[in-house]
């Protein structure tokens, strides 16, 4: 245990917090260009073909981002907006693409949780 004199001379260093989404550089979202759009398989015990994209960001980073929802229109050179948020069963995927902004269209025929998938409110059915 240090003496009071040692603490005066060399104060205790604060533990530095490590960010979970360094590519955003403290911003809520970042714009980027898709360099590759592909599917990948999740960790055990899950099984699927998850849609992901490799995105080159305006901050200079190149990251892997998840494409949420059923069906998408993204391809190489699509401009997208990404946010933080990892995908638990995809190692290395720490970002999500925001649907309904820039080149990423909203999910079609989405009824619930529409705001999360960039879908406009459906027109009321004609009687």
From Swiss-Prot:
Cited Pfam families: Ribosom_S12_S23 (PF00164)
Residue ranges that the Swiss-Prot or TrEMBL entry lists as coiled coil: none
SUPFAM superfamilies: Nucleic acid-binding proteins (SSF50249)
PROSITE patterns: RIBOSOMAL_S12
Molecular function GO labels: rRNA binding; structural constituent of ribosome; tRNA binding
UniProt keyword list: Methylation, Ribonucleoprotein, Ribosomal protein, RNA-binding, rRNA-binding, tRNA-binding
The keyword Phosphoprotein appears for this protein: no
Transmembrane segment boundaries: none
The keyword Acetylation is assigned to this record: no
GO cellular component: small ribosomal subunit
Subunit structure: Part of the 30S ribosomal subunit. Contacts proteins S8 and S17. May interact with IF1 in the 30S initiation complex.
Similarity comment: Belongs to the universal ribosomal protein uS12 family.
Protein name according to UniProt: Small ribosomal subunit protein uS12
Native source species: Microcystis aeruginosa (strain NIES-843 / IAM M-2473)
Gene that encodes it: rpsL
């Amino acid at each position: 245990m240090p003496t009071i004199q040692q603490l005066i001379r060399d104060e205790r260093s604060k533990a530095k917090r490590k960010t979970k989404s360094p590519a955003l550089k403290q911003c809520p979202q970042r714009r980027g260009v898709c360099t590759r759009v592909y599917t990948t398989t999740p960790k055990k015990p899950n099984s699927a073909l998850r849609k992901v994209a490799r995105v080159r960001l305006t901050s200079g980073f190149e990251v892997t981002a998840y494409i949420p929802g059923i069906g998408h229109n993204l391809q190489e050179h699509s401009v997208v907006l990404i946010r933080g948020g990892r995908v638990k069963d995809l190692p290395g995927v720490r970002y999500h693409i925001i649907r309904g902004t820039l080149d990423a269209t909203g999910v079609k025929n989405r009824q619930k949780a529409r705001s999360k998938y960039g879908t406009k409110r459906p027109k009321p059915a004609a009687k």
